[in-house]
Amino acid sequence: MQTPGVLLLILGLLDASSSALIRIPLRKFTSIRRTMTEVGGSVEDLILKGPITKYSMQSSPRTKEPVSELLKNYLDAQYYGEIGIGTPPQCFTVVFDTGSSNLWVPSIHCKLLDIACWVHHKYNSDKSSTYVKNGTSFDIHYGSGSLSGYLSQDTVSVPCKSDLGGIKVEKQIFGEATKQPGVVFIAAKFDGILGMGYPFISVNKVLPVFDNLMKQKLVEKNIFSFYLNRDPTGQPGGELMLGGTDSRYYHGELSYLNVTRKAYWQVHMDQLEVGSELTLCKGGCEAIVDTGTSLLVGPVDEVKELQKAIGAVPLIQGEYMIPCEKVSSLPIITFKLGGQNYELHPEKYILKVSQAGKTICLSGFMGMDIPPPSGPLWILGDVFIGCYYTVFDREYNRVGFAKAATL
């Protein structure tokens, strides 16, 4: 028979673990870009001509205050998890995106010609006992047009299914999308987006889900962490943990960098080295840590230098190809952050993909110029995060990295 002291200790441990840590399994799917390429379609036919700007901050002509204009695409997003909205929860697959701050899902009231809405789960306020009408219109500007709809309030369950444990974020304002831009989202495997950036970039100044979660004291620590499985065939695709970290997913100690601007998860990068032949970001630069971006993104001219240094040749859609037989001889690329070296070996920054029945090797780097005042910026997307377990700390406004474990 257990002694009362032992029983109390066990119950205390169980209670601490259930209240402090929330695990959301992540699944990995084929990205929109790859889906379109595999069926012979051109992404360029689906989006506006010219480059897609992902990040832009501009001033309001009337108030002179900074106004966030999120020009973000999810062509390369690959990792999704499930949340619930309403009571009982209606389940949705979302991208947990540290590069934006709003939650939106398709609405049951979406426009008749919104084909993307037809093929995704839709929120129905009539089926929720905790729904509260808001009705304020919202618009999020993407490279392919404007996603629009109206705001509503309801309970958000993370994750959706109660048998996985989880939390309920009450009185969460979110977007019901009634119109999605172009036809890009038709090919998306996800229903919506759950932004995990700072409130500063939230459209309509809506309190982000994680901020509401902190306000309601639903986790012991105000942090969340990502493990992304980079095995192309591996499932689960990874795990998002709310309220803590899991040492099973990384080796050694976490090294932290302070957030330099509380909008995106922005940090200072000392420099970037391509083997011993090329140094980029000389004198330091700014970088965004973004779970909603699959690739590594940098200023166009610098990325062109990098592609040339690794022998990559341009394809369409801004992609660069490497002969697969040369991958093993490519240089190590080193990101210097906070005085620490974060190395990416060629098999990590070169992506093997299927195209027209053949396997080709693509560079994991893409060039994109982000204009001032936000830019220029580098974006450390899933290629980097897959190699380094990443902690987003709102308690101390910092980002932590440690070498990811291979499971």
Swiss-Prot record:
InterPro entries referenced in this protein's UniProt entry, alphabetically: Aspartic_peptidase_A1, Aspartic_peptidase_AS, Aspartic_peptidase_N, Cathepsin_D, PEPTIDASE_A1, Peptidase_aspartic_dom_sf
Signal peptide (UniProt feature, chain positions): 1-20
Localisation: Lysosome; Melanosome; Secreted, Extracellular space
Catalytic residues of the enzyme: 97, 290
EC identifiers of the protein: 3.4.23.5
Keyword Protease: yes
EC class: hydrolase
Keywords, in A-Z order: Aspartyl protease, Disulfide bond, Glycoprotein, Hydrolase, Lysosome, Protease, Secreted, Signal, Zymogen
Similarity comment text for this entry: Belongs to the peptidase A1 family.
Protein name (record): Cathepsin D
Native organism: Rattus norvegicus
Recorded name of the encoding gene: Ctsd
